[in-house]
Amino acid sequence: MIRVENVSKYFGERQVLKNINTEFETGKCNLIIGKSGSGKTVLMKCLVSLYTPDEGFIHFDNRVLRHLNKKEKVNLRKDIGMLFQGGALFDSMNIEENVMFPIRMFQLSDYKTMKKRVDFCLDRVNLKGINNYYPSQISGGMQKRVAIARAIATQPKYLFCDEPNSGLDPQTSIVIDQLIKEITHEYNITTVVNTHDMNSVMEIGENINYIHEGQLWWKGNSENVLTTNNQELNDFIFCSALTKRLKK
């Protein structure tokens, strides 16, 4: 579990996160949603240590992020898998090298063991046998699945996904959502997804955190998100659905 305790963040005199308190549960898909400029991306960056909160604490189970020394932060980083917006594969590396990259970076295994782990992860995302391909030789949806394989290569306890369906068609987005949800449940990972895609909210939103103007305005799940009386959230849902319809 990840617990956010009284977290605030400032850029100069502007407060972009205002006393956020929430929990991201283990074995569930925890979503951070909100309009552009709401603070959801800033919160995500605080969780993965790209930003440091000016106030408050972030707890990774029994580890408090602010209190960790350099070695302890490296050990925590080994427990974190990242799925970046767009996938962020290395074009100069083949698929096997891309998936193997985080294992090599943390020197977690010998080559034979790493190779076995890569094969397992690619098989898990239904991409068996593409080890020697390069990212430019496969589709965008396949690239995203490779990115998921890379994210789970180190057997993480925590998985962070930043707009995982960005640039994907609706059918491929459903596949990616289902894969993230399956992996979360199968490996009992604490998964945090930053998204504005309402299809993702309905498909995998087991613990939804709606951020508005830097504050946590609503918390719930996909079963009650459409019946809430929160006007700001209702406006967000309507605008998201309208935007998606206009893009078709």
Task: State where each predicted segment sits.
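Helix-to-loop junction immediately C-terminal to a conserved catalytic motif
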Residues: V48
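Conserved ABC transporter NBD signature motif
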Residues: G56-V64
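Conserved ABC ATPase "signature" region
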Residues: Y111-G129
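Conserved ABC ATPase signature
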Residues: Y134-I138, M142
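A short, proline-enriched helix->beta-strand linker immediately N-terminal to the Walker B motif
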Residues: A153-K157
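Catalytic Walker B motif of ABC-type/P-loop ATPase nucleotide-binding domains
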Residues: L159-D162
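Helix N-cap at the start of a conserved alpha-helix in ABC-type nucleotide-binding domains
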Residues: P170-T172
